[in-house]
């Protein structure tokens, strides 16, 4: 099998799996006062410190959650609610965000009367220059796009914010580009385990100590009174191991994946000359190659490749199965037909040249069959 969908989820690292299994054999609620509880708490706090050190944050700024979607919702709704009480009622969000961000922002507009400004992007997917109105409660712009891989100018956005809290979804960025929470200047940053070799179902929100945030979940207040719920200790420990690993290996993997990605792009262009590469040609993740294939339905092409044991995607797995054009490509100026004719190939720590060979061997026949089937309009 050629697995080319690492942006949806990447295989768990051996060292993360080993420590998960080891920790899962232990007993203890990290909120309990007895010995097993204190042992569990120690593992949680050590993991918090390790993640903080790897990502340029203070341990107290690491709030464990159930994953990227929860972290995005906590940051967007929580900061908005806290700031609305101070008279700020507007949210600025890029038009190419993951649906965990877009839908949370739209929910605030629909249910909380938030004023929303969707920030336009250029043809590569980079946010165009903007100014934040005085009533802005929050700005949210992802660090790296999950579909086309375009990197956003986060330092410039923070400078433009002029004191307005900035949230960034860095789920796709950690381990692929240098990420430093303090140096970036953002107020809140979303990360998750399963996109970097950790378990599914665990993530974190890095939240500045001076950033007000109203809780989404109420209960024990385990995480700085901002997030409640019994902590998943084995997943948290494995998550920390994975974060440390990908940050430590980032430069090596950058070089390796860049070479693989460039080879993939070159060879796809050779066998499908009219394929169109989407996203920024330079400021892009080494893991991502996103193409439009004129005359093809993306879903049909995906299934034809899947029949040959090649796993790819048409975009976010969180929106898979929904027959609609990519909102990312539409925001970049593509027409709906083109936006439905695209595939995302994403690489990760298990990717090899054999995966690219398998894709290139299967792609021409799949494209020919998909074109015979045509594109719905």
Show where each model-derived region lies:
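Pyridoxal 5′-phosphate
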Residues: 1-377
């Amino acid at each position: 099998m050629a697995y080319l969908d690492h942006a949806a989820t990447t295989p768990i690292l051996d060292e993360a799996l080993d420590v998960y299994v080891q920790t899962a054999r232990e007993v203890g609620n990290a909120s309990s006062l007895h010995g097993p509880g204190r042992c569990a708490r120690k593992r949680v706090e050590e993991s918090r410190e390790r993640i903080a050190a790897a990502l340029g944050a203070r341990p107290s700024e690491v709030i464990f959650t159930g994953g990227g979607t929860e972290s995005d919702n906590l940051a967007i709704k929580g900061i908005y609610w806290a700031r609305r009480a101070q008279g700020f009622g507007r949210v600025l969000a890029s038009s190419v965000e993951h649906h965990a961000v877009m839908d949370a922002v739209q929910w605030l507009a629909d249910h909380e009367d938030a004023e929303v400004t969707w920030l336009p992007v250029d043809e590569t997917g980079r946010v165009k220059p903007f100014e934040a109105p005085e009533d802005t409660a929050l700005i949210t712009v992802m660090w790296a796009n999950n579909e086309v891989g375009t990197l956003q100018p986060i330092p410039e956005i923070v400078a433009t914010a002029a004191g307005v809290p900035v949230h960034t979804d860095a789920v796709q960025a950690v381990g692929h580009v240098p990420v430093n929470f303090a140096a970036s200047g953002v107020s809140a940053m979303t990360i998750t385990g399963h996109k970097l070799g950790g378990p599914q179902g665990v993530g974190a929100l890095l939240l500045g100590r001076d950033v007000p945030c109203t809780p989404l979940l109420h209960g024990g207040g385990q995480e700085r009174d901002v997030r409640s719920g019994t902590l998943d200790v084995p997943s948290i420990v494995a998550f920390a191991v994975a974060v440390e690993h990908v940050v430590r290996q980032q430069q090596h993997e950058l070089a390796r994946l860049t070479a693989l990605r460039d080879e993939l792009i070159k060879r796809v262009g050779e066998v499908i000359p009219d394929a169109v590469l989407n996203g920024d040609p330079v400021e892009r993740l080494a893991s991502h190659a996103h193409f439009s294939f004129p005359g093809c339905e993306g879903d049909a092409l995906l299934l034809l490749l899947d029949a040959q044991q090649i796993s790819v995607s048409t975009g976010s797995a969180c929106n898979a199965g929904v027959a609609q054009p990519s909102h990312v490509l539409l925001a970049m100026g593509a027409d709906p037909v083109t936006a439905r004719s695209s595939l995302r190939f994403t690489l990760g720590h298990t990717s090899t040249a054999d995966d690219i060979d398998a894709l290139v061997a299967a792609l021409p026949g799949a494209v020919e069959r998909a074109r015979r089937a045509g594109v719905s309009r």
